[in-house]
């Protein structure tokens, strides 16, 4: 009987129960495991995280309005955006940036992108003065040097055709004396260019012919609009130069 009682006591002890000498059952209390407090204090403000910033009601209303206008998810994103925009002023006032380095690099890239887009929308007269632009891109320096070299080495005919006076149709024979133009440029400009690029004798002949045949040229044009190429008038009637040659005994 004693052996059985000892075995029963051992089984009871394994179950967490103790049997007293009187035969009463006593529940054994399990050992309580004490948890260690966390090493990191979650209530402390790490780098201002979770802080409530007090601001005037006007500023708070403006931040709330900007959050909706910019499509941000929270007011914190709007304040972060405002800090990025004001970073140059912050650096100018404090000497150092108050935002992390990652924000600084991002803001620099954002500012570079905004500057490039703003420059693209500006007119070319404000960007390069007289610098030529092709589809928003400036002509390279080597092309400029080649163009200047070509302009310096061209002959008289090319220099004459690059003038903005328009297209001139000059007869091959000087005795015809007809000068027709598409642009309707004044004849003084043409005579001045002829003075620089042709012989003085030919210029003198042109002046005499134009003075002598002023009325005949006006009558020959007829109903044609001035400033247009009137080849029909010069081909239909005899030229005053040919009339003068018939009358001249020479």
UniProtKB/Swiss-Prot annotation:
One of the record's GO cellular component terms: nucleus
A Pfam family it matches: TCP
Compartments, record wording: Nucleus
Domain TCP: 39-93
Predominant place of localization: nucleus
GO biological process, one term: positive regulation of long-day photoperiodism, flowering
Superkingdom: Eukaryota
Record keywords, A-Z: DNA-binding, Nucleus, Transcription, Transcription regulation
Protein name stated in the entry: Transcription factor TCP7
Native species: Arabidopsis thaliana
Organism taxonomic ancestry: Eukaryota, Viridiplantae, Streptophyta, Embryophyta, Tracheophyta
Gene: TCP7
């Amino acid at each position: 009987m004693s052996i059985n009682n000892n075995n029963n006591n051992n089984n009871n002890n394994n179950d967490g129960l103790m049997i007293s000498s009187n035969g009463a059952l006593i529940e054994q209390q399990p050992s309580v495991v004490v948890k260690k407090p966390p090493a990191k204090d979650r209530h402390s403000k790490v780098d201002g995280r979770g802080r409530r910033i007090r601001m005037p009601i006007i500023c708070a209303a403006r931040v709330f309005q900007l959050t909706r206008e910019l499509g941000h998810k929270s007011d914190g994103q709007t304040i972060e955006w405002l800090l990025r925009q004001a970073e140059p002023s912050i650096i100018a006032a404090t000497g150092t940036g108050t935002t992390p380095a990652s924000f600084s690099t991002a803001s620099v890239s954002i500012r570079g992108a905004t500057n490039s887009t703003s420059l693209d929308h500006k007119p070319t007269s404000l960007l390069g003065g007289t610098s030529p632009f092709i589809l928003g891109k400036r002509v390279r320096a080597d092309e400029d040097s080649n163009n200047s070299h070509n302009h310096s080495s061209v002959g008289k005919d090319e220099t004459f055709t690059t003038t903005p006076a328009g297209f001139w149709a000059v007869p091959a024979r000087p005795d015809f004396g007809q000068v027709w133009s598409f642009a309707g440029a004044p004849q003084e400009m043409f005579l001045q260019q002829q003075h620089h690029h042709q012989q003085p004798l030919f210029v003198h002949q042109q002046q005499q012919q134009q003075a002598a045949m002023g009325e005949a040229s006006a009558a020959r044009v007829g109903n044609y609009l001035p400033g247009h190429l009137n080849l029909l008038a010069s081909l239909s009637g005899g030229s005053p130069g040919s009339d003068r040659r018939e009358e001249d005994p020479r």
